[in-house]
Amino acid sequence: KAAGASPKVLNLFAYTGGATLAARAAGADVTHVDSVKQVVTWARENMEQSGLDGVRWIVDDALKFVRREVKRGRQYDGIILDPPAYGRGPDGEKWVLEQNIAEMLECCARLLAPKGFLVLNLYSMGLSAMLARSAVRQAFGPAAEEQFGELYFEDRAGKQLPLGVYYRMKR
């Protein structure tokens, strides 16, 4: 909401739309991108059941989409990025996190407005929070605010089971 009356938020690898719906409920104009048509249909149903509307739904390979958005000169006030370790686009495009994350972050850096925010979740045991921070900083430069760390699940015995990492920044 700090971005203005209707901030533009891009949700990539958006799956069933939890973050999309949270952003929309907060008043953002949201573009939801996922490569699986059935998942986007499910997300749209979730929106309808939540009493919301006005989301831009895109079934596309996320990397191809952001490349086109860069060419179009688009900007977003916020980008939510939740890529899988491995996946396929709608036309069989291959996504491998370790191979594609640098280009994805570079494109996102060009799309993010000057006072925008980025939320990045990575669920790959091969990447630490420090590596994620380094990759984001390489693409975006220094952040005005940043927060990063490990994502984990705590079991009943109090043992922390690792899930991945998060990185949040504001320009």
Report residues per predicted region.
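Conserved class I S-adenosyl-L-methionine
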Residues: S6-Y15
